Design a protein with these regions (language model features):
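Transmembrane signal-anchor hairpin modules in multi-pass inner-membrane enzymes, especially those
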Residues: 1-133, 172-175, 179, 252-258
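Membrane-helix interfacial "entry" motifs
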Residues: 11, 111, 115, 140-149, ...
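Transmembrane alpha-helical segments of multipass membrane enzymes and assembly factors
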Residues: 56, 60, 163-169, 192, ...
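Hydrophobic alpha-helical membrane segments of integral membrane proteins
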Residues: 64-68, 144-147, 175, 279-284
């Protein structure tokens, strides 16, 4: 009988190096927990995950863009539960990280920069320039207020347009994005259904009855549900866009099961749009 291994087989040098690195990592982790406390131990334990993320995103920057897409989807929910965290800075850091990944990739292999020279990029650049010029508007209240507004409606728009064209370079990435988007849509609708059938949680009640959200979301015609979005208008607009995108996407899929899935997601998004009670979603 042929044997596939033996305990007497010499261990290769790379395996010895990996084993030594793992042993050293465990030792450092134990030292951090025992000598410097829980926070230090958690910080050290995150380093391997961060290195893995760096390696994966360097190999495929599209994954980093999908991660940015997911974080951007949920970050509005986090603002309701933790008011003091700088969530805008988190998005800034993630966008900078994506540009850094693209720059590092350019050192290894050529990047098709011309992909970013599209009509959409020109439109985004014109819009950003217009918003920048608004700083000299005499009606502007403050530079800080101007920057806070322009950062989200102009800078993010331009940077995301450029990054998407540089990273999503293959058709398969569009499928990946639709798959991620569909899951996020179902989660958003599920959260709205929880609000409708089980009620609001403590943070949502605080926003409604203390911060004044009640005046626009609990009205004479009923309750406008907002899921984990900032308000019902954003939730309804997002669900309206999801309904349109997934309805159209279902027409182009040949796989019957995928076609059915996308139609169900579109139907769920339509339901979410309806219970949001926002009229602006109809414009989508």
């Amino acid at each position: 009988m042929e044997r596939y291994g033996s305990i007497t087989t010499p261990v290769s040098v790379p395996r010895l190096i990996v084993g030594a690195m793992l042993a050293a990592g465990v030792a450092v982790l134990i030292l951090a927990f025992t000598q410097y406390g829980l926070l230090a131990g958690l910080a050290v334990s995150v380093i391997p995950a961060a290195l893995c993320i760096l390696w994966v995103t360097l190999r495929n920057p599209a994954i980093s863009m999908l991660g940015l897409f997911v974080v951007n989807y949920f970050i509005m929910a986090l603002t309701r539960y933790a008011h003091d965290l700088p969530f805008g800075m988190i998005l800034d850091a993630l966008i900078f990280y994506n540009f850094l990944i693209i720059t590092l990739q350019a050192l290894i292999r050529p990047i098709e920069w011309k992909r970013a020279s599209s009509g959409l990029t020109v439109v985004a650049a014109i819009w950003m320039a217009y918003c920048i010029l608004e700083i000299v508007n005499p009606e502007s209240v403050s530079v800080a207020g101007w920057f806070s507004s322009v950062r989200s409606i102009a800078f993010y728009f331009f940077f995301i347009v450029v990054l998407t064209q540089l990273t999503m370079t293959e058709y398969k990435y569009l499928k990946y994005m639709l798959a991620v988007w569909s899951v996020l849509t179902l989660i958003a609708v599920g959260k709205a259904c929880m609000q409708k059938f089980f009620g609001f949680n403590a943070a949502e009640n605080y926003w409604l009855f203390v911060l004044g959200g009640r005046s626009t979301h609990i009205i004479h015609s009923g309750v406008r549900y907002f899921s984990f979005f900032s308000d019902a208008a954003n939730f309804g607009g997002s669900m309206g866009l999801s309904m349109v995108v997934f309805s159209i996407s279902a027409l182009y899929y040949r796989n019957s099961w995928m076609k059915l899935y996308l139609l169900l997601v579109a139907a769920a998004a339509c339901y979410g749009m309806l219970i949001s009670g926002t009229r602006s979603a109809l414009a989508v």
